[in-house]
Amino acid sequence: MIDSKKKHQKLKITLVSPEQIRAWSETILPNGKRVGEVTNPDTLDPTTKKPQRDGLYCERIFGPVKSGVCACEKKPGQKKKGFAFVDRKKKKDSNFCKYCEVELVDSRIRRYRMGYIKLACPVAHIWYIKRVPSYIPTLIGKKKSEVIDLVYCNLFITRPAANRPTILRFRGLLQDENLPSWIGILFPYISSWNFVEFQERELATGGNAIQKRLTGLDLRILLTHSYMEWKKLLRNYKIQRTQREKNKIQKRKNFLVRRIKFVKYLIQAKIKPEWMVLCLLPVLPPELRPIFVLGEQIIAESDLNKLYQKVLIRNKNLQSSFEMQGDPLYSTGKRDFMTFQKRLLQEAVDALLDNDRSGEPGEDLFNRPYKSFSDVIAGKEGRFRANLLGKRVDYSGRSVIVVGPSLALHQCGLPREMAIKLFQPFLIRNLIRRGVAPNIRAAKSLIQGRKPFIWKILQRVMLGHPVLLNRAPTLHKFGILAFQPILVKEHAIRLHPSVCTGFNADFDGDQMAVHVPLSIEAILESRLLMFSHTNLLSPSSGSPITIPTQDMLLGLYILTADKNQDISEFRYHPSKSKKKISSKKNPCFSNYDDVFIAYQQKRVQLNSPLWLRWRVADGGILTSVDREVPIEIQHEPFGTSQEIYEHYAIQKNRMGKISNIYIRTTVGRILFNREIEKAFLSFSKLLESPQTNPVF
């Protein structure tokens, strides 16, 4: 129910009275007639394919199929021989056809205008009988099996008529000694056509019996009695000693608690219990149960139409039986058949509301069960979760995530086919501004052609538009972060592995949603607050949340590992070589560039040991030992010397000053050290910038 009187709209799902259903469904035409009741089970005319009058698609009830065109296919102001429109001078009748009685309004009215079916007998709502918990048995205090037998006319109950004692309810009259005499008195009523009157007065079954029982309930008295009984059972529970008696009392207490909660809700919501029995069945608007004409004879329609047709046909048959019951020739056997027709009507309404819980679910020609009203609104594909709560959002997409090791922390790889759809309006505007396309149609043609220059322009367009990546469930703020998109040719989203901790994601098939912020405020918020490289610490503990993953740690280990060789292989042997430190197995390099050139030329491997000349101005060597003792000290004839340690060597001149330092390392360690140096250098430049005000 949408409350249009208040500023904020709300959706409320509750039980309504038959009067409210009639108020929603009935419409007063300009000629004073009331329409809204659906009596014809037909949908479309088989020859003209037009809606049948008073049928499930009637234009008098639900509005015109075409905007401003009546069933006669005439627009306002046109004349047709044989009839005339209502006087156009009268404003109230200007949009009404006098002949077909169809209002000439917008066809969108067929999306929300309802109808109703007046049931020949009351029908109990299946949701309140067969579902758990079952509310109708809870209220009337009967077993669920007994209530089901009563609803489906397998059980009769005696009830008072007009608050007066009946024959079967006189206390003390039906005793064992006078039972034969009573059978003789009642037999003429049961075996003749007087049974109809006898049944209406003395017996009740079906939805009518449930309705009478619920109508006679006083909720406040029932609440008081239930509470008093619960207190009495609470005292008896402490007295009883056997476990069997305690279990019996506990079961009754649980039943009373359920009843008290439900009765309190009914009183608070001002709902009458008898509203759980239907007298008027609402008919959904036609646009919510569409029908499509695919050919001359082939028609595709919603399953709800088939279920509505079954209800209308059985309701019509029951009405005919009621009209014939006053006939003396109407035999008792046919009256039994009328009771059977009540059960058929109950089953038809059950199938419409919840086909899965009905006795025999209705099936189509391919033995597939029809989708009932419960199936339409329930589940992930239902009306609520698919259209109201979690409907698909514009400018959004979804795909599988894979690792992107070459991406920066604030970047993500966006598939080209997804990006060209998400940024199509921005791309069209850019093409028109550049003069590449004269209009929107030409721009769309270029985009559909996938010209090579389109991808370059698209990448420029994406520079000013960050995207939001979200992985469900979004449990904290790190579940949705902003990234700068980079075009990739694959169909998967590429993601930096360090940000997966915040998303609680891995690369085993997880999917993530992409959203494009549109407004200036959303783009600014994405850049200032939601970018991944600005969300590095957990707000709860202050610990880093963007940390290297196991794959990255394993890669760093492989990168910095070296071959375990003894240090004696790199000692100075003057008898074997003229070179001081290097040999064929351990080459010597003077700087980083020489190492990288040799690695590209495949003269050295990633983990091969080598000697690298270290910059003396950078200071000493950091070791794991505070004061490392040299393994060997070599003195030259010219006064120079060199000290050989475990991982480095130091050359000194005649004055004892350090002239050269050589460190024992690998290509992988040099690569790792260079990246660390670049990171510290960029960070120091950022701190030295006058626009930066760091807070520590």
Swiss-Prot record:
Q: Which GO terms describe its cellular component?
A: chloroplast; DNA-directed RNA polymerase complex; mitochondrion
Matching Pfam families? RNA_pol_Rpb1_1, RNA_pol_Rpb1_2, RNA_pol_Rpb1_3
- First-level EC class: transferase
Residues that bind Zn(2+): C70, C72, C97, C100
Q: Which UniProt keywords apply?
A: Chloroplast, DNA-directed RNA polymerase, Magnesium, Metal-binding, Nucleotidyltransferase, Plastid, Transcription, Transferase, Zinc
Q: Which GO terms describe its molecular function?
A: DNA binding; DNA-directed RNA polymerase activity; magnesium ion binding; zinc ion binding
What reaction is this protein's catalytic activity?
A: RNA(n) + a ribonucleoside 5'-triphosphate = RNA(n+1) + diphosphate
- Indicate the principal place this protein occupies in or around the cell: plastid
Q: Where does Mg(2+) bind?
A: D506, D508, D510
Q: Where in the cell is it found?
A: Plastid, Chloroplast
Cofactor(s) the protein needs = Mg(2+); Zn(2+)
Q: Can you quote the record's cofactor note?
A: Binds 1 Mg(2+) ion per subunit.
Q: Name one GO biological process term.
A: DNA-templated transcription
**The protein's Enzyme Commission number:** 2.7.7.6
Subunit record text: In plastids the minimal PEP RNA polymerase catalytic core is composed of four subunits: alpha, beta, beta', and beta''. When a (nuclear-encoded) sigma factor is associated with the core the holoenzyme is formed, which can initiate transcription.
What does the UniProt function comment say about this protein?
DNA-dependent RNA polymerase catalyzes the transcription of DNA into RNA using the four ribonucleoside triphosphates as substrates.
Query: Which family does this protein fall into?
Result: Belongs to the RNA polymerase beta' chain family. RpoC1 subfamily.
Q: What is this protein called?
A: DNA-directed RNA polymerase subunit beta'
**Protein species of origin:** Welwitschia mirabilis
